[in-house]
Design a protein with these regions (language model features):
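N-terminal assembly/interaction segments in proteins that build large macromolecular machines
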Residues: 1-176
Length: 176
């Protein structure tokens, strides 16, 4: 049965994974966010899929993993995380992949899971301890989808494109 599941997963390797589960969690001074992708929202919203994502995130936080490769190698259940994902892929018949992982360490970290839907999560770290402000900033990050923290981290191409959009919008408003 396991070999059959691996064969199914291999056949689906060229398919697009446009849905999935994103989870974020903070334990003491360590926070992590992880994304496990799949093909359909039906699978993404399933309890087993969300539990697998949660189990992988729990293992990553317990090990204080810093990279996605470290996470993939962590023991989750009776196998490593990557094998657990492949096994779940064989069960559902959908392509699945661990797609993203990021951590923050230190004080003043706030995490946010938008409407507890497990599709849009953020984590932020402030210079000062202010839970309410941190929560509001994390919500704004989710709502506004910023491209950078400050101007120095924005590419020149993005600046040029944004300027062109702003100029075009201003011209349209002047014509009205």
């Amino acid at each position: 049965l396991r070999e059959r599941g691996l064969a199914i997963a291999a056949k689906r390797s060229d398919r697009e994974t446009s849905n999935g589960c994103v989870l974020v969690k903070k334990v003491n001074d360590f926070a992590a966010i992880i994304a496990l992708k799949c093909e359909t929202d039906f699978v993404a919203n399933g309890a087993d899929f969300i539990k697998l994502t949660s189990d992988i995130l729990d293992a990553a936080i317990a090990a204080k993993a810093h990279t996605l490769d470290e996470v993939k190698a962590l023991k989750v259940g009776e196998s490593d995380a990557q094998a657990a994902v492949t096994q779940r892929s064989g069960i559902t018949g959908e392509k699945m992949e661990l797609d993203g992982y990021c951590v923050l360490e230190g004080d003043n970290i706030e995490v946010y899971d938008h409407m507890n839907k497990h599709t849009l999560c953020t984590m932020v770290q402030l210079n000062e301890n202010n839970e309410e402000a941190g929560h509001k900033v994390a919500m704004q990050v989710a709502a506004m989808r910023p491209v950078a923290l400050d101007e120095s981290s924005v590419s020149e191409e993005t600046k040029k494109t944004e300027l062109e959009v702003a100029v075009a919008k201003t011209k349209e408003e002047l014509v009205e």
